[in-house]
């Protein structure tokens, strides 16, 4: 009986280690980014095409008001509420303190600068095929917008959905591959 318990504990620990390894965030390093001078005007076009203001600006904001990306909305889902964060260039409450590679990893890999996964309510799954140059340009444009010192709202998904490590397994095994771009295509 004691031997069976030891074997069970070893199997559980081994399975946990495999889960932890398979679900680890895979991110880009700064050296993986292309040598690219940011184009703020292209970043503005990417901002408009990606619809960043539709979630991160105040509801109904128009013109210049839609450029204050203070977050604060609550996305109601069948699984719980998700607070929309401040993505203004504020260095305390927004993303102003993020490096370019932090931003690109959040946008295309769904991984925060701290190494945790974002839930796909943030549509990183749609942006993961974006050209890295476009992501760099978007960061440069966001850095030109007005900062907001609005703190992110508390809340989120209930346990166990708040445990995001399984997203790594979903990414590794279930997230569909991106279609290959035709040769010579400008994505």
Q: Where are the regions that the model predicts?
A:
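The canonical Cys-X-X-Cys-His
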Residues: 43, 49-59, 103, 138, ...
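Gly/Gly-Pro-rich "capping" loops immediately C-terminal to redox-active cysteine motifs
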Residues: 41, 45, 59-100, 118-132, ...
